[in-house]
């Protein structure tokens, strides 16, 4: 037998799902319990009470009905007097029935004559109740829905109990209490100083978000910081909410299952209300039982009594009332689901009241679950929404970040870079720790692979900050921070992971002198938008661009006329149009790297103030235009390295002011004698070519300090090379030298000598005369050092070890 506890479990879901049950689900639950009690009571009465009592056998039948003998006799006399006939009375067997015969008749009449509704009424009530209970709890146990609901309830309880939720709600209450005070203060300021109001209004017009600043005289009630454990727990909840939302918002299976449950309930309600009242009239107290058992008892018809008829009528009527209440609430819930947009849930009201204005609206099953939770208690959705807000998550990340990155840990990251500046390099963090602004000695701040960085007003504490590097990171600058950067920042390096637009705050850095942009999008045609931006960078002197362009952007040539250095790395894409270079008359240094240039652009020859030209990693095969460089009287540095140049034109001798010449990594086989007319040369790089000899005329380069012919095919060095007394760096590695002239000892200023990769067998003793040569700067095989006489080797070793 099914116990009451087991029946209760069928009608009630797990208690953990109570927050997902609206008031009608609770109402259904209690009605279902009462229905179960009705079914159990009716079943118990039917099992314990006598079913049918057949105590009165019918001895006389008249007109196919049971009649009392004298009534039958009176009727017969009337009939005979009218017809004139005398009907004989039927004869019957006169004997009493045994108790076993009565029991037999009871059983036969119960099975054959009692209406089926009266017999199965308790079971029908039980069946209906079980169907109602199953429909109410099916969505809680169906695998596709129960897993999502269980996950949601688990997360919701964690959100409700998290200290971060309490902190966030407290911040909202605190800010709402502070706002009236701020408004009253602002009205007072507006009434007393109209000029300052205009200034504030102009600042508000900038297209950047205002920072959330607290009033100095009011202490925030949420100033307490979460400990590390609580912060990690809140962080885990944020991740769970993200994954849950991504998973649940894709489908609406919970909504559809819940809707189908209610539709089944309404259909069952209509069915019960239709047939139960109709068959209720078949439950009668008296039953006329006509059965063919006359051979056993002597009677054919019996007058029976169904003792449970009246109480079953009462229970059935009460059951109908319960079903009507159940059906009406089911109809209301169906109307609620069809009327409302339950697949969309908006936090608009909450966004207006709280300081988390970025709480997103949700859809599908996620929205439906929140609607159900609102029917139970709207506070659950409010607390849950805290973990949907990116602003809230960023605040938590900031707190966790501050706990992890203390001042001591940040100070240990400070280093001196190659420019002898104090630099802090932060890599792959969740944000910018607040303790960074305590490092007042920092000069360079480098941020790499940090998804969201916000520079608050506290950046003004970095009084020595002059350089900012932002690599593959998103940087948002507050107004007070922007004002500080405008006055102090001199160098800015921006590198984007994907092609992106230049942040608007860059154009407000009026004192910026060097700007390095990698992976940004610059329009090739001038527009009013960029006209308003670039023209404010009046102090910009150096611009580095790394992108794929077909022409030099017009915003650079037209809006930055005072630019002195322009570097363009085109990443191998062909740079077609260069005519607009003529406008940059103040340019002193020009770098066109990886632009797939086949010839030297003629527009370069109009840059009269040009000092340095770098055409590295292009596709230059000939440089016949080199004669035109004589129109650039200030040109002192020419870099044509990493190309496919086969020869140097004789006209190079016209570049009398040339001081540095880079021709490495080409296909040059010989040097023209006119090259040595460039007597001002002090840096000459001819490494990685196909040279076989060096002309004796190199002696005319009396100012030569750096000479590199690494990785060539040179077999002998001219004596004229050793007449370059100012030579400091001599790179002769990976050639075919078999002998080093003793004249090398005359290079008293030599500090760096490379000889490795040749066919030398000994080193000249005269190396001892190179007083400035250090051991770390002598690149030679150890076996050659051992070939020197011992006194010379020891003396040279002693001199070299002083480095």
From Swiss-Prot:
Heterohexamer; oligomerizes with other LRRC8 proteins (LRRC8A, LRRC8C, LRRC8D and/or LRRC8E) to form a heterohexamer. In vivo, the subunit composition may depend primarily on expression levels, and heterooligomeric channels containing various proportions of the different LRRC8 proteins may coexist. PANTHER family: AGAP008170-PA (PTHR45712), INSULIN-LIKE GROWTH FACTOR-BINDING PROTEIN COMPLEX ACID LABILE SUBUNIT (PTHR45712:SF22). Belongs to the LRRC8 family. The volume-regulated anion channel (VRAC) channel forms a trimer of dimers, with symmetry mismatch between the pore-forming domain and the cytosolic LRR repeats, a topology similar to gap junction proteins. GO terms for biological process: monoatomic anion transmembrane transport. Residues 1-25, 141-261, 329-803 are cytoplasmic. GO terms for cellular component: endoplasmic reticulum membrane; monoatomic ion channel complex; plasma membrane. Glycans are attached at residue 78. Gene3D superfamilies: Ribonuclease Inhibitor. LRR repeats lie at residues 415-439, 440-462, 464-486, 488-509, 511-532, 539-559, 562-582, 586-607, 609-630, 634-655, 657-678, 680-701, 703-724, 726-747, 749-771. Residues 47-119, 283-307 are extracellular. Keywords: Cell membrane, Disulfide bond, Endoplasmic reticulum, Glycoprotein, Ion channel, Ion transport, Leucine-rich repeat, Membrane, Phosphoprotein, Repeat, Transmembrane, Transmembrane helix, Transport. The modification Phosphoserine is found at residues 186, 196. It catalyses: chloride(in) = chloride(out); iodide(out) = iodide(in); taurine(out) = taurine(in). It is a multi-pass membrane protein. PROSITE patterns: LRR. Non-essential component of the volume-regulated anion channel (VRAC, also named VSOAC channel), an anion channel required to maintain a constant cell volume in response to extracellular or intracellular osmotic changes. The VRAC channel conducts iodide better than chloride and can also conduct organic osmolytes like taurine. Channel activity requires LRRC8A plus at least one other family member (LRRC8B, LRRC8C, LRRC8D or LRRC8E); channel characteristics depend on the precise subunit composition. One of its GO terms (molecular function) is volume-sensitive anion channel activity. This is Volume-regulated anion channel subunit LRRC8B. Disulfide bonds join 55-304, 109-289.
